[in-house]
Amino acid sequence: MAFADLTTDYKGAKSAIFRLALATGIRTVITAGFYRFWMKTRMRRYYWSAIRPGGMPLEYVGRPTEKLLGFLTAVVFLAFYIGIVNLILMFFSYSLFDGNAPAYAVSVIGITPLIFFAQYRARRYVLARTRWRGIRFGLEPGVAGYVWRALLHWGLTLVTAGLYWPVKTYYLEKYRTDRTFYGDARMHQGGSWKMLIKPMMHLYLSVALLGGTGVLLAATEDPRYAPLIFLAVPWFFYGLAAWKAGSFRELTNTKTLGEARLKSSARNGRIVGIYAGGWAAMGGIFIAAAIGVSILFGIIFAATGFAVENIDEDGYLTTLGNLPAFVPILFGIITYFAIFIFWGVLKEVFITLPVAQHFAETTEIANPQALLGIRQRARDEFAEAEGFADALPLGDAF
């Protein structure tokens, strides 16, 4: 008997993620970043539990203490690398080239493999701590192969000024997916890199228009070409959203798990709307908050004797009226951290959650009866967790 395709429900709510992100963000700031490992764990558990293929939620069972210990381990290693290796590079740089620029260049190149190393290890940890229907996901060891492939594909992407991007995206995703397991079943990434050309076309064309406009303006000094910039820039941002939706859709539609396969109907227009509406809402909220704070402090300054006469000929304040001198400093600190916290909170509410919801609700599992024979896999202890990703830092991505 054939089963119907499994659809995915999404049970997340903006109000709940706002409260969670705000509470954990404040605690992270108060603890000077120490709470971030607990914040990440709680946020991830919320998102995972909201995604429910076939009505059954994903589970995230990672622990914050794992992340903390992994971070400390990574910091010790990176401190050695940055301290000792860079010292050696600086010595040879001054000895051979009479300057420090070569040392900085080699140092950046030297740390690049660690970034790819951290990305693969972080993905392995997240999958090892994710379960669905009680069965664990997993990623088999293969970090060395991923690092050299990432270096090769990213190098070709830079050499081709971004034209190679779809090829890079496909082959790196294929490497990761082909080593991903659900229980004892291996996933497979089908298709080819050619299927990603179409989602990339808006970016190709908008960048070509922007670059061509710049060349025309420089060569002719004719301002009549300038309006093309106002076409190219919005088109570029549309292309970014279209690439996110299109690449997810094409890659998902060619993923299989044994006889089961994934299907996605993610829509470009919906992702564009989420980003446009989300950034507009965030900008409007911050502008309104800035106006409100300005009015409030105008009232406070007026009540405490501040006047235009307190500003000298160079534009500096000579007195704050009856306000203590530490008040502006305290206000600046509070404002900085308030912006830091609320930017992250609003981004979760208006961008991250709606995008996750759309991708989840447009994803289905075809031929789900093939999943019935899948058995549990052994637990991957993986003591270092996401330490290198947090330390570099690459740990903000889900």
Segments (PLM) and residue ranges:
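Long, contiguous internal "core" modules enriched in hydrophobic/ aromatic residues
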Residues: 98, 139-141, 145-154, 158-270, ...
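Membrane-helix interface segments in multi-pass membrane proteins
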Residues: 82-111, 210-237, 289-344
